[in-house]
Design a protein with these regions (language model features):
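PLP-dependent class I/II
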Residues: 3, 11-13, 18, 25-32, ...
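Generic structural signal for well-ordered alpha-helical scaffold segments
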Residues: 23, 77, 81, 107-108
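A glycine-/small-polar-enriched, mobile loop at the entrance of the PLP active site in fold-type I
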Residues: 36-39, 54-73
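Conserved N-terminal alpha-helix of the aminotransferase class I/II PLP-enzyme fold
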Residues: 63-96
Length: 388
């Protein structure tokens, strides 16, 4: 089969590849602790499940409007005002099956040969993949351990050229766990305002999972709502990964183009999932708060545990549920550490270079697992590292 050349530009998520290797070892009888997948280990809150079940019984089993059911778009707009302090109209909301389609559609709508897109590196690997697929040029914005994985904003203007059309932000950040402060977002906004045709895609999927600060959105800065596409969803905050539901909040001029891309690809998100999402946003938030409280305990457990292992350094994550320790002093590449920790220690984790060139020398561990399993993983990794 002769494939289109553009398929060579499409990357992947190695988390699922590592998961497959781990499952194969488990099938052979090896005990594996899973710290590779970025998925909450909690069930969807019961009132959300009940709303979804009732929606199915009430006949929400048909096509819905491509940009989303009116009741969900209205709920998202209300929630955005409450959480972000941004006056949002339902007409500026587009709902999709998962948040990735919003990323893809935005890059297909704005990216093309000759256009440059700035993105965080280390960062979610699909950013770079989608930028390349759109034909645009990926321009990495390095996140360094020495600054707690925050970008050096004094260098940002030097990355921007006349061809730069989009800057991708992710806060809290995957894989590093850093969270952009209000002051940092103000500085970015001031830089962006100096350029006429420059936009922000703000990935805020982890906005509810924070430990050291409240959530700040760059769209709330003066003059930035019309320059910002917010990307969010329900998978992380409400443990709804399998419900496949995300959304974008965007300038009105972009909505018809993103909607047309959705018409040509997914048609619409599942109607019953959307009714469940209304219950998620407008129902009790106790389960979310309890989940974040538990993640905070695990964050301390894993970061302190990793720092207790010889020659490993791990900055304290500020948000999300990932630790991103340095293994530079161990004499192994990130990929070698990933492979050997799986086979020799029985701990599944991800090589840092899966998140971009600046991730070499690091690994990512998800602490979306029990305290008991995290402690066992630390003990296994400690033994493995001491054996090197």
């Amino acid at each position: 089969m002769t494939l289109a050349n553009r398929m060579m530009n499409l990357g992947t998520e190695t988390a699922f590849e590592v998961l497959a290797k781990a499952r194969a070892l488990e099938a052979q009888g090896q005990d594996i602790i899973h710290l590779e997948i970025g998925e909450p280990d909690f069930g969807t809150p019961q009132h959300i499940v009940d709303a979804g079940v009732n929606a199915l019984r009430d006949g929400y089993t048909h096509y819905g409007p491509t940009p989303g059911l009116p009741e969900l778009r209205e709920a998202i707009a209300r929630n955005s005002q409450l959480v972000r302090g941004i006056k949002t109209e339902p007409e500026n909301v587009v709902v999709t099956p998962g948040a990735k389609p919003i990323m893809f559609y935005v890059l297909l709508a704005l990216g093309e040969p000759g256009v440059e897109v700035i993105y965080p590196n280390p960062g979610f690997p699909i950013y770079e993949s989608m930028i390349k697929f759109s034909g645009a040029v990926p321009v990495p914005m390095q996140l360094q351990e020495e600054t707690g994985y925050h970008p050096d904003l004094d260098l940002l203007p030097s990355l921007i050229t006349n061809n730069t059309r989009l800057i991708i932000l992710n806060s809290p950040e995957n894989p590093c766990g850093s969270n952009l402060s209000h002051a940092e977002l103000e500085k970015i906004a001031n830089i962006v305002r100096q350029h006429q045709n420059l936009y922000i895609m703000s990935d805020e999927i982890y906005k509810d999972i924070l430990y050291t600060d409240s959530h700040n959105s760059i769209a709330a800065m003066p003059g930035m709502s019309e320059r910002t596409i917010i990307l969010d969803g329900f998978s992380k905050s409400y443990a709804m990964t399998g419900w496949r539901l995300g959304y974008g909040i965007m300038p009105s001029e972009l909505v018809p183009h993103i909607t047309r891309l959705a018409v040509n690809s997914v048609s619409c998100a599942a109607s019953f999932s959307q009714i469940a999402a209304v219950a998620a946003l407008e129902g009790p938030q106790d389960d979310v708060e309890a989940m974040v409280t538990e993640f905070a305990i695990r964050r301390t457990l894993i970061s302190e545990g990793l720092r207790s292992i010889p020659n490993i350094n791990c900055p304290e994550p500020e948000g999300a549920f990932y630790a991103f320790p340095s293994i530079k002093n161990l004499g192994l590449t990130s990929s070698e550490f990933e492979d050997r920790s799986l086979r020799e220690a029985g701990v599944a984790l991800l090589a840092g270079n899966a998140f971009g060139e600046f991730g070499e020398g690091y690994v990512r561990l998800s602490y979306a697992n029990s305290q008991e399993n995290i402690q066992k993983a630390i003990e296994r990794l400690d033994k493995f590292v001491r054996s090197l």
